[in-house]
Every structure is written in C-alpha cells, then in structure tokens.
From Swiss-Prot:
Keywords: Electron transport, Heme, Iron, Membrane, Metal-binding, Mitochondrion, Mitochondrion inner membrane, Respiratory chain, Transmembrane, Transmembrane helix, Transport, Ubiquinone. It is found in: Mitochondrion inner membrane. Pfam families: Cytochrom_B_C, Cytochrome_B. Heme 1 (or BL or b562) is low-potential and absorbs at about 562 nm, and heme 2 (or BH or b566) is high-potential and absorbs at about 566 nm. GO terms for molecular function: metal ion binding; ubiquinol-cytochrome-c reductase activity. PROSITE patterns: CYTB_CTER, CYTB_NTER. It comes from the Eukaryota. This is Cytochrome b. The chain crosses the membrane at residues 33-53, 77-98, 113-133, 178-198, 226-246, 288-308, 320-340, 347-367. Binds 2 heme b groups non-covalently. The gene is MT-CYB. CDD domains: cytochrome_b_C, Cytochrome_b_N.
Length: 379
C-alpha cells in the first residue's frame, strides 16, 4: 500500500513541494530566505487579522483605535509591534533573497524571476498602504506625497490622483479604501507566492556553483527542513529582540502625532525599506522623470536576464562581477542613507551620483564585466 502522502491528492502536492522535493546537495544559507519570506507572510497575515478586529478605518477614530490596541487590548501592543517590525524583517529577507538571485544567477529562471518582481511590487504596495493606516503625521503626508506622484502622468494624472483619493485630498475615503486593499493584498501575495513556487519546481533550484545539479540531488526533508528551522529561529530571535527591546527603532516619531492636514512635518520620508527608491526619485529634478526612475529602480531587475553576457551563470568564480555586486550593495546602502536626509547640499549631489551608479551597474558595468570575464577564460 502506498504512503498516504504519495496517494492523497492534497498531501501529494505538499509532499512534492516540501518533503520528497529533489534539492541540490550544496545550497547554502542564502537559500533560506525563500522559506523565511513565507514565514514572514504568515506572521503578517495572522497579526494583521487580529489588528483588523480592533482597528477602525475612519479618519476620526483610526489613530485612537491604534492607541486603544496598544493600551487596552490583551497583548495588543505586542501584536501591533510584531506586525510593524515584521514588515521590516519581511523587507530584509526580500532584499537578501533578490540579492542572492542576482549574485548566483537565479534570474535565468525567467518565469520564476518575473513573478518574483511582481511579488516585490505587490509587497511594496501593501507596505505603503499599511503605513497610512495608523493615521499619524507621516502616514497622512506620506500618502499625500506618494499618491501625488501619479499626477505626473500626462493628461490623465490629476483625474487619476483624485480617483484614488476618492475626493480632492487624502481623507476618509482614501483611508477606508487603503484599509480594504491592505487587507486583501496579502492573500493575493500568497497566491502569487504559490505560482512563484510552481514555476521554481518546474526547473528545480539553482545552486551556488550555477552548474546543473540533476546528478546530485537530495530530498528536501529532512536536510533542508532542519536548515530552514535554524533560519526561522534566527529570524524570530531578531524580530523579538526588535519588538521587545526597541520596537520604535525603525519607525518615525512623527507618526505618534495624529494626522494634521494644516501642519507639514519638516522632513517627509517613507519607512526605511523605501528610502533607496525615494532617493532615486528625489535625485531627478523633473517630476515625471523622477516617477519613471522610481518605477525603473525595481523594474530594472526584469532586464537583468537579458543583459547577462557571461558564460558562467553564478558569480562564484567571477571576481570582477563580485566587485560590482558589492559595489551595488554599498550603493544601495548609500541611497538608503540619502533618502532619509533633507534635500540640501551635499546630499543632493551624493544622491544623484549614487542613482547614476545604480543604473550604470545594471545597464553597463555588469554586461561589460561579463564580456571581459569571458575573454579571461581563454587566456
């Protein structure tokens, strides 16, 4: 008699995805972030569900309902802070996951990669709308500034912004619809993540060497389930250190001031995980140009497979490309720092140089280094 996990229609899907899945024998800890993203998503959906039970999406009561959650609801404070800092952990894992894909050439699985880019946009949209919900100063002004960017779209821009706002400014209608979207999007993300896995399992996982590993596979369980549990424990440790010791470390103090349309905060800035894109947006003096650069800062990942010139898939044996990769990481950290600074000299110039370098690495330097490394192979 066959094992139930191999015969039952539902159990069979789980078995082929997480138990008997053939996995390369040499994948490193950089391959842990996929499962960690799944865990982050589950944590966010669960904590978000409990927060939604007590939250009211009305401009008059939104701020006080969040205060009520923190002060009066049993363990409301910890649920709220796990949700807020869980978003930060989500983005840390997301950046590591994408970075791994760029470094080891996982982008050659184009279907999986493109679904991943779509997932990234969806997660960013969800996080942005979630940041608006507490209805603090930074929530209100962040929503005003970011939605206003759509007015740069020629001809339909102004109508589009007013349509999204549901009026002539960010108000009750905007908050209500943002709550509705923020609630539904994580379930769409879950569905996209399932499609992401479906495409990945069509090809099998990549590995650090970038070489096809069909002749050397091991079962996912117990080897990688144990490895994933170690990563999970470390994730929970870092998350709980944040939540219990410095829950407001990554937040903005201005968001503890109720939203006031008559008083603009001195520096309007998004959460830390959007600062790199915000710096790229601000580095271009033209509004439409800035919006295009903002979108392209993520969308540029879609053309990485097209600009892959090297004969080797992974960067493991490509020192020149490795230098460029770490230059890109340093550049992103610089952009993140610049995004949080006021718009004044020397930050404007640094931001512009960092933005030029960001696009140059992807569009020029990486493809050229691939060609040079191909030549070096013949020496």
């Amino acid at each position: 008699m066959t094992n139930i996990r191999k015969s039952h229609p539902l159990a069979k899907i789980i078995n082929e995805s997480f138990i008997d899945l053939p996995a390369p024998s040499n994948i490193s800890a950089w391959w842990n972030f996929g499962s960690l993203l799944g865990v982050c998503l589950i944590i966010q959906i669960l904590t978000g569900l409990f927060l939604a039970m007590h939250y009211t999406s009305d401009t008059m009561t939104a701020f006080s309902s969040v205060t009520h959650i923190c002060r009066d609801v049993n363990y409301g404070w910890i649920i709220r802070y796990i949700h807020a800092n869980g978003a930060s952990m989500f983005f840390i894992c997301l950046f590591m996951h994408v970075g791994r894909g760029v470094y080891y050439g996982s982008f050659t699985f184009t279907e999986t990669w493109n679904i991943g880019i779509l997932l990234m946009f969806t997660v960013m949209a969800t996080a942005f709308m979630g940041y608006v919900l507490p209805w603090g100063q930074m929530s209100f002004w962040g929503a005003t500034v970011i939605t206003n960017l759509l007015s740069a779209i020629p001809y339909i821009g102004t109508n589009l912004v007013e349509w999204i706002w549901g009026g002539f400014s960010v108000d009750k209608a905007t908050l209500t619809r943002f709550f509705a979207f923020h609630f539904i999007l994580p379930f769409i993300i879950s569905a996209l993540a399932a499609v992401h896995l479906l495409f990945l399992h069509e090809t099998g996982s990549n590995n650090p060497s970038g070489v096809v590993s069909d002749s050397d596979k091991i079962p996912f369980h117990p080897y990688y389930t144990i490895k994933d549990i170690l990563g999970l424990l470390l994730l929970i440790l870092v998350l709980m250190l944040l939540v219990l010791f410095s829950p407001d470390l990554l937040g903005d103090p201005d968001n503890y001031i109720p939203a006031n349309p008559l008083n603009t905060p001195p520096h309007i800035k998004p959460e830390w995980y959007f600062l790199f894109a915000y710096a790229i947006l601000r580095s271009i003096p033209n509004k439409l140009g800035g919006v295009l650069a903002l979108i392209l800062s993520i969308l540029i990942l879609a053309i990485v497979p097209l600009l892959h010139t090297s004969k080797q898939r992974s960067m493991m044996f490509r020192p020149l490309s490795q230098c460029l990769f770490w230059l890109l990481v340093a550049d992103l950290l610089t952009l993140t720092w610049i995004g949080g600074q006021p718009v004044e000299h020397p930050f404007i110039t640094i931001g512009q140089l960092a933005s030029i370098l960001y696009f140059s690495i992807f569009l020029i330097l990486m493809p050229v280094s691939g060609i040079i490394e191909n030549r070096l192979l013949k020496w």
